[in-house]
């Protein structure tokens, strides 16, 4: 029977084989026609690499089937050296979750039961109601919009 072998260059070779022929025999015939040594040849059919000891019938290769010839690659990527770090890894800041943290922004008067705000609220329309400004030693600062009020310095 006749089979086709497509090479890397796109050239198609026709080979006269029998279904009982081994893959070794096919590789030898390719060497006769193309001059590529069998140890460098890899034959692929239906997405599978053909093993040397098996026959064409094992892979269900019939007349006028096309095998793909690719060359065997040697070696691989260069092995990389593992990095050694001189300093220990920096610890990430962990956010502390405080339950009912909102209560520290308000104070309830015991006598009247009136609620007063302990922090200044941001007047910017982008921030909206309930956005408090941070108290620093010399200023009030809104973390949302960046608005800053600086205290008057006494000379």
From Swiss-Prot:
Cellular component annotations (GO), alphabetically ordered: cytoplasm; nucleus; ribonucleoprotein complex; ribosome
Stretches assigned to the Ubiquitin-like domain: 1-76
SMART domains noted in UniProt: Ribosomal_S27 (SM01402), UBQ (SM00213)
Listed Gene3D superfamilies: 6.20.50.150, Phosphatidylinositol 3-kinase Catalytic Subunit, Chain A, domain 1
Zinc finger (C4-type): 122-145
Domain of life: Eukaryota
GO terms for biological process, alphabetical: translation
Record's keyword terms, sorted: Cytoplasm, Isopeptide bond, Metal-binding, Nucleus, Ribonucleoprotein, Ribosomal protein, Ubl conjugation, Zinc, Zinc-finger
UniProt cross-link Glycyl lysine isopeptide (Lys-Gly) (interchain with G-Cter in ubiquitin), position: 48
MF GO annotations: mRNA binding; structural constituent of ribosome; zinc ion binding
Pfam families assigned: Ribosomal_S27, ubiquitin
UniProt-listed InterPro entries: Ribosomal_eS31, Ribosomal_eS31_euk-type_sf, Ribosomal_zn-bd, Ubiquitin-like_dom, Ubiquitin-like_domsf, Ubiquitin_CS, Ubiquitin_dom, Ubiquitin_ubiquitin-like
Cross-link type Glycyl lysine isopeptide (Gly-Lys) (interchain with K-? in acceptor proteins), residue numbers: 76
Family: In the N-terminal section; belongs to the ubiquitin family. In the C-terminal section; belongs to the eukaryotic ribosomal protein eS31 family.
Miscellaneous comment: Ubiquitin is generally synthesized as a polyubiquitin precursor with tandem head to tail repeats. Often, there are one to three additional amino acids after the last repeat, removed in the mature protein. Alternatively, ubiquitin extension protein is synthesized as a single copy of ubiquitin fused to a ribosomal protein (either eL40 or eS31) or to an ubiquitin-related protein (either RUB1 or RUB2). Following translation, extension protein is cleaved from ubiquitin.
Name listed for the protein in its UniProt record: Ubiquitin-ribosomal protein eS31z fusion protein
